[in-house]
């Protein structure tokens, strides 16, 4: 049973090698080119479904440059399901990857992964790849649990609340 549920927009499915971002006006997906040009880890192939939590804006990240439009809270969705670009789904936060640059990544699971309830439950090889991939541009300071992930989402929420 998924406890805290958030709505997730998938920008880059697991296994994809292109950088994509939903435009700020939410009208189109922008293809920003091959990921390996920016993140050569795993030859640029996304090791986990990547997107954002709908109804959030990342306040920590945007405070570095007040002229920049803030991004939504990033989410890495651990799932056995394959997703399409632009698909929305539901997930449950289990942890948060805290990066030095403030661009933290919430880790969530969906109903296909009942055996994964916390970061430590993810197989070691997959965790290591996720950490190398998302730690390439900015060092990872620490990994925190579900409570901290939910608190971070709520602190960056612009509408609604996490469904319990």
Predicted regions and their residues:
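Hydrophobic N-terminal alpha-helices or hydrophobic patches in metabolic proteins across all domains
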Residues: 1-164
